[in-house]
């Protein structure tokens, strides 16, 4: 059996004011093309299909078009759960009717002990739920962490698990030690959200969503597929794609398949003038860029100038104040320096230049006014 594991599509995502829908449509086209070659027996989407509980109509239409092609045109069974970004109600609409075409949308906690069976494989689904929802479902106020909730869920599943089959757990959660990214919204506020990987030992395989790095943890049987695209500048070095899990002769193997996006995210560091003169190394001008530049304090609206050359510049950081670098302490007694010299040294440390005669005169005028005000 060939299983495709994907998650964290985040359709409708907006990054620093820029809609990524065009990029998402492009990567889903690539995903569909790949599925035509892969011919999988089932596709598992482990949550966060949308980026928000209230996706716009274009995001909804993109998901519907993708699902129609994969499920109705290509007749591939789909198993989907909601993530912490999704609305259960919106995602679950018509789910019972969709099962007739082997599209299983699992957002109801009541279905956690009702596996989706495909061949000799049982898929146990755990949709994302808050601690309060878990307390209500199990009628137990003692559940205060995701680990405690997962313990109850796994015991609930264990009541019906068939050890003669291959049992796969599908969830949207954080395993301890997993690599985090800036674009991942915390599962909960005020409680520990990570869980111990040893809890899953009753399963042959665990397919997860939420963490965007496809190699978030080192495990022989727990997999994160990662997101289809880079969704924050902390993900620029992360590969993006999907995973293939194959079950053959009672052996389970997996491999990661990268997908090439329309645009990548890049972080570019250097001096402002080098950026404007196109001397800094940029893979492609159309990529989404975050510039971290020095020596631009004297520039009026540097973002505007950068966008004239790099139209998809999404972020700009002034690195002049870099407190992480070591500070060079000159052997000077600051008490012996006059005010103008101190200010000139400070200005030079920031801009790499010294005060002009006109700037010095203005500062002298301000200092005189301050001294006169202080003596009153």
Curated annotation (Swiss-Prot):
SUPFAM superfamilies: Metallo-dependent phosphatases. This is Nuclease SbcCD subunit D. The keyword Nuclease applies. One of its GO terms (biological process) is DNA replication. Belongs to the SbcD family. GO terms for molecular function: 3'-5' exonuclease activity; endonuclease activity. The keyword Hydrolase applies. Heterodimer of SbcC and SbcD. It comes from Staphylococcus saprophyticus subsp. saprophyticus (strain ATCC 15305 / DSM 20229 / NCIMB 8711 / NCTC 7292 / S-41). Keywords: DNA recombination, DNA replication, Endonuclease, Exonuclease, Hydrolase, Nuclease. It comes from the Bacteria. SbcCD cleaves DNA hairpin structures. These structures can inhibit DNA replication and are intermediates in certain DNA recombination reactions. The complex acts as a 3'->5' double strand exonuclease that can open hairpins. It also has a 5' single-strand endonuclease activity. Pfam families: Metallophos, SbcD_C.
């Amino acid at each position: 059996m060939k299983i495709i594991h994907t998650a964290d599509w985040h359709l409708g995502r907006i990054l620093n004011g820029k809609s990524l829908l065009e990029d998402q449509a492009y990567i889903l086209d690539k995903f569909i093309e790949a599925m035509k070659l892969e011919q999988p027996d089932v596709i598992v989407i482990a949550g966060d299909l949308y980026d928000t509980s209230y996706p716009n109509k274009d995001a909804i239409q993109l998901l519907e078009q993708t699902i129609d092609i994969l499920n109705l045109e290509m007749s591939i069974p789909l198993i989907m759960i909601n993530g912490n970004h999704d609305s259960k109600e919106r995602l679950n609409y018509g789910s019972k009717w969709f099962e007739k075409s082997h599209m299983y949308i699992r957002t109801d906690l009541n279905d956690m002990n009702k596996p989706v069976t495909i061949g000799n494989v049982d898929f146990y689904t755990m949709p994302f739920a808050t601690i309060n929802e878990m307390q209500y479902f199990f009628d137990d106020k003692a559940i205060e962490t995701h680990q405690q909730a997962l313990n109850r869920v796994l015991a609930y599943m264990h009541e019906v698990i068939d050890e003669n089959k291959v049992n796969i757990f599908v969830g949207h959660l954080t395993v301890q030690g997993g690599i985090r990214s800036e674009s991942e919204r915390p599962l909960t506020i005020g409680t520990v959200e990570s869980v111990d990987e040893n809890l899953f030992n009753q399963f042959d395989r665990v397919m997860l969503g939420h963490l965007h790095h496809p190699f978030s943890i080192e495990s022989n049987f727990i997999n994160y597929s990662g997101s289809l695209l880079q969704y924050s500048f902390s993900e620029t070095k992360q590969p993006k794609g999907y995973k293939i899990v194959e079950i053959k002769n009672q052996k389970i193997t997996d491999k990661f398949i990268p997908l090439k996006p329309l645009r990548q995210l890049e972080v570019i560091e250097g001096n402002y003038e080098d950026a404007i003169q196109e001397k800094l190394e940029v893979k492609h001008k159309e990529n989404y860029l975050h510039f971290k530049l020095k020596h631009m304090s004297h520039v009026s609206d540097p973002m505007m100038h950068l966008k004239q050359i790099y139209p998809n510049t999404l972020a700009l950081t002034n690195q002049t104040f870099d407190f992480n670098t070591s500070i060079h302490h000159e052997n000077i007694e600051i008490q012996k320096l006059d005010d103008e010299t101190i200010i000139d040294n400070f200005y030079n440390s920031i801009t790499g230049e010294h005060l002009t005669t006109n700037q010095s005169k203005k500062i002298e005028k301000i200092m005189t006014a301050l001294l006169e005000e202080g003596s009153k």
